[in-house]
Amino acid sequence: MKRLFVNFMTFAAMATALTFTACSSDSDGDDNGNGNGGNGGGTGSSIVVGENILSGTLTGEQTLDAKEYILNGTVIIADGGRLNIPAGTTIKAREGFSSYLLVAQGGKLYADGTADKPIVFTANTTSPVSGYWGGVIINGKAPISGSKTDKSDTALTEINNDYKYGGSAADDNSGSLTYVKICYAGARSTADIEHNGL
């Protein structure tokens, strides 16, 4: 009974801390010219291009300002990279399957909102629909289901075979998400390939 109570309390704490919202709309959508702009942006210690465009690969540590940003194509937090997103930040993703934030193995995402100032990932359009953009994908090093007895199996993401996930580090840590809303994610490239991230 004590173990059941501890498991329940652990689950309740996680559910309270992680506020993921799947948003949907009955609208047919309108991309307003916000198509996927590619990934020609920053690399290294900054993924911010200009005033508010997020693009490229982060290999160092970066803290965003609490304001609105546009996610332009694929943004990757590479091994050794760390992205800190403060409370009250909104990130609007451009439309498309290639528009997503991926935390590679060894990368870290700290998105710590509050009840009054959540962090919002959403579509960059006035007429959003479910599946408008990819979402947030975290590729950790923890064992994956159905893995070998030694729990060392890894797999490759369907969306980009350059990035593996899984392994044998049961205590792996890819960061923290608290009071985060992720809306209109889950884009598909075909009937069989879609984003299944957060």
Tell where the protein language model's regions lie, with residue ranges.
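Generic detector of short alpha-helix boundary/capping microenvironments
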Residues: 10-11, 168
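Bacterial N-terminal signal peptides that target proteins for export
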Residues: 1-10
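Beta-strand/loop edge motif enriched in small/polar residues
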Residues: 24-198
